[in-house]
């Protein structure tokens, strides 16, 4: 019972991490709801499926490019429960926004740079503060 679903799930997880919701959808589409739930239960019992670990790894690999709002939206879109998202997300830090801004090629244009940071999930206040610090550093910002 469910050994095919379990084997399929293990093959998927061997390639990359999945949230419980995404893996459940993949398994349910192929094997049905009952087998999917049974396989997910076994995976959780064996320690191969953990939304907190998935969310932490997801944030670690993308935190340099995206701010907390963007990361939150991406995690929620992948079916990670909101309480897990709130637990693993870091606070928006001005230093991170400034580091992202330094890599942006249109950083001399304030409006574009602030929009760029907002698009990466940084709140407006953090984006503006990063812009102000960049001006103080005198790195060619206008």
Swiss-Prot record:
Localization recorded for this chain is: Cytoplasm
Predominant place of localization: cytoplasm
InterPro entries, alphabetically? RecX_HTH_1st, RecX_HTH_2nd, Regulatory_RecX, WH-like_DNA-bd_sf
Q: Which GO terms describe its cellular component?
A: cytoplasm
Gene3D superfamilies named in the record: Winged helix-like DNA-binding domain superfamily/Winged helix DNA-binding domain
Query: Tell me, what's a Pfam family for it?
Result: RecX_HTH1
Q: Name one GO biological process term.
A: regulation of DNA repair
Q: Does the keyword Cytoplasm apply?
A: yes
The record's comment on protein family reads: Belongs to the RecX family.
**Transmembrane portions of the chain:** none
Coiled coil spans: none
Tell me which positions the record assigns to the signal sequence.
Answer: none
Indicate whether Cytoplasm appears among the record's keywords. yes
The cysteines covalently paired via disulfide bonds are none
Q: What is this protein called?
A: Regulatory protein RecX
Q: Which UniProt keywords apply?
A: Cytoplasm
| Function as written in the Swiss-Prot or TrEMBL entry | Modulates RecA activity.
Protein species of origin: Thermus thermophilus (strain ATCC 27634 / DSM 579 / HB8)
């Amino acid at each position: 019972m469910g050994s095919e679903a379990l084997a399929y799930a293990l093959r998927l997880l061997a390639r990359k991490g999945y949230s419980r919701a995404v893996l459940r959808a993949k398994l349910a589409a192929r094997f049905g709801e009952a087998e999917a739930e049974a396989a997910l239960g076994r995976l959780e019992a064996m320690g191969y499926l953990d939304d907190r670990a998935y969310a932490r790894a997801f944030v670690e690999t993308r935190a340099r490019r995206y701010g907390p709002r963007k990361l939150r939206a991406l995690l929620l879109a992948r079916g990670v429960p909101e309480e897990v998202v709130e637990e693993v997300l870091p606070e928006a830090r001005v230093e991170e926004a400034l580091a992202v801004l330094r890599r942006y090629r249109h950083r001399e244009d304030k409006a574009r740079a602030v929009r760029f940071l907002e698009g990466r999930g940084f709140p407006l206040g953090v984006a503006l503060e990063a812009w102000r610090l960049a001006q103080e550093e005198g790195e060619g910002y206008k």
